[in-house]
């Protein structure tokens, strides 16, 4: 039955339920043990992730809970599209096809141990089939994408406009096609492997320019480094663009409201 067995898929979905969802078990412990197992099985994977894994574990658990929920409801189109985008985006981390193989093995073993008595033949069949689907879609989408895995660029300007706000301009090594209102994941040299989302404040530039507005977040390592420590000549790495924020230019008047650096994507749209 595998992916047709809603009861077996429901067991897998509930294993990843958020801890505050009123369900038995501890998905946080499951995900923590999965990463521990994966890093032991394939030590090369550890260097792809940031030192602090808390946010990564939460995001991974939420993603799998949603994917399995969609499979229970027999809605495959959105999960497949989501996993394909995830696979394409993971190229920026240096993820290789063999990493997906070890991920599937580690997650299957961790689920078997975590579910204990609930691990039946039907659940194992559903787990194997679903994990093959998840890793296969991600790996296949990554292989099929002919675009750059990332864009590198050099900081050419850093303007400290206030105590906690900076405008950073870069010259990319090659043009990045994106739509105004989209956002990218950014890695700065002061904080390796700690990626943060930023919205370009200008439309895509054929001349390879790009601009970001960054406000210092108290306690935030990356925003503090960008505002306080970024200098011309620094090399940044950017992911492929995500999301979409569009204006119907054939419609009526539009009122745009933004606060702080939230103005950046609106500025790009207006420009």
Residue ranges, per PLM feature:
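Core of compact, soluble alpha-helical bundle domains
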Residues: 1-151
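Short alpha-helix boundary/capping motifs
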Residues: 28-29, 220-223, 263
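Ferredoxin-reductase
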Residues: 147-235, 241, 252-253
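Fold-independent oxyanion-binding glycine-rich loops
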Residues: 240-241, 259
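Low-complexity, polar/charged sequence tracts that form flexible coils or short amphipathic helices
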Residues: 247-250
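Short, glycine-rich nucleotide/cofactor-binding loops
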Residues: 254-264
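Histidine-anchored nucleotide/phosphate-binding helix
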Residues: 265-271
């Amino acid at each position: 039955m595998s992916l047709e067995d809603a009861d077996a898929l429901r067991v897998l979905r509930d294993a990843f339920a958020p801890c505050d969802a009123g369900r038995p078990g501890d998905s946080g412990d499951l995900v923590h043990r999965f990463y521990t197992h994966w890093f032991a099985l394939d030590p090369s994977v550890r260097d792809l992730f940031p030192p602090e894994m808390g946010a990564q574990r939460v995001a991974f658990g939420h993603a799998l809970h949603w994917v399995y929920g969609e499979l229970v409801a027999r809605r495959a189109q959105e999960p497949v599209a989501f996993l394909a985008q995830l696979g394409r985006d993971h190229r920026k981390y240096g993820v290789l096809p063999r990493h997906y193989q070890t991920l599937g093995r580690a997650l299957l073993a961790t689920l078997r141990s975590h579910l204990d008595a609930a691990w039946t033949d039907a659940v194992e069949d559903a787990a194997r089939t679903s994990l093959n689907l998840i890793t296969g879609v991600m790996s296949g989408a990554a292989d099929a994408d002919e675009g750059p895995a990332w864009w590198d660029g050099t900081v050419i300007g850093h303007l400290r406009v206030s105590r906690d706000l900076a405008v950073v301009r870069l010259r990319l090594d090659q043009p990045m096609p994106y739509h105004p209102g989209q956002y990218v994941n950014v890695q700065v040299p002061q904080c390796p492997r700690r990626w943060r989302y930023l919205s370009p404040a200008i439309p895509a530039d054929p001349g390879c320019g790009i601009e970001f507005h960054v406000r210092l977040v108290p306690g935030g390592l990356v925003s503090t480094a960008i505002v306080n420590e970024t200098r011309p000549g620094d090399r940044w790495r950017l992911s492929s663009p995500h999301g979409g924020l569009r204006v119907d230019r054939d419609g009526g008047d539009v009122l745009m409201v933004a606060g702080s650096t939230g103005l950046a994507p609106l500025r790009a749209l207006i420009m």
